[in-house]
């Protein structure tokens, strides 16, 4: 992803680190047990390997945007420092990791739910999913209507990052 579209954009690892868990425990503001377990699992997510992404790409009926592959290898998802998408009402809660022990942070585990429509790349706080479609554009899968909204949010992955503010 070229640096211009990434200017001032950082990605924080999704989940809870051991230090953060201790902090929350000290302040007595831990989430419920299940959520806590999931967030700890999500934090333990390893880096994505080029080989596993290549294997996934072979199984797919669609190409994967090169810039998105680079993003996965470099950041493997995370919480963007800017999370609103210009020109839409979409807010990004987090970009998904390629693979994670927490299913709802794991592209590879969520993909079967969307197959024909695209690759899940991010989630919104409302529980909707951003998909990278076969035409390489980014669409919103609205969980209320269980379908894709017709107009793309962005024309490509790089364009999506550029639109974040």
Give names to the regions the model predicted.
Residues 2-129:
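A surface-exposed partner-binding patch
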Residues 127-131, 145-152:
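Short, surface-exposed beta-strand/loop "edge" segments at domain boundaries and coil↔beta transitions
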Residues 147-165:
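Compact, glycine/acidic-enriched structural inserts
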Residues 132-136:
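Short acidic-glycine loop/turn motifs at beta-strand connectors
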